[in-house]
Amino acid sequence: SGFPNRAAFDQALGDAVAAVQPDWIVCAGYMRILGASFVQRFAGRLLNIHPSLLPKYRGLHTHAQALAAGDAEHGASVHFVVPELDAGAVIAQARVPVQAGDRAEDLAQRLLPREHALLCAVLQLAAAGRLAERDGSVWLDGQCRFSPLRLDCQGMLIP
């Protein structure tokens, strides 16, 4: 990797990100766990999309886990990133049905377009200045959200 240790990598990544002065940092398909120092440096500006209805199925192989559990539905979540894996406040979720005979690959393929729509909808809120994280909670339009927004069939977020 060209770095003597994880701390050096996190510092270099943080410096590269800080150099472009982003309003938001989005982890989409980034399959590495971010170090605590990086997460703390950009706290409240780091978003991740995760293929499960958090807090269910943190980490990898979420589609297979949903099938093994016999879940009737599966989904995706956009959440604020905190040092603990997939544990940040959930902003919004999208759901899909689990169908008889589904394999993990089928479920992943059915969910992917909903994940894309979900991430785009949340990023619209963020870019418009409507979204914030305070004290581990999601705030939308100056109001604390006690449950995640839901993506409807038209790709709109609803309470």
Predicted regions and their residues:
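One-carbon transfer enzymes
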Residues: 1-159
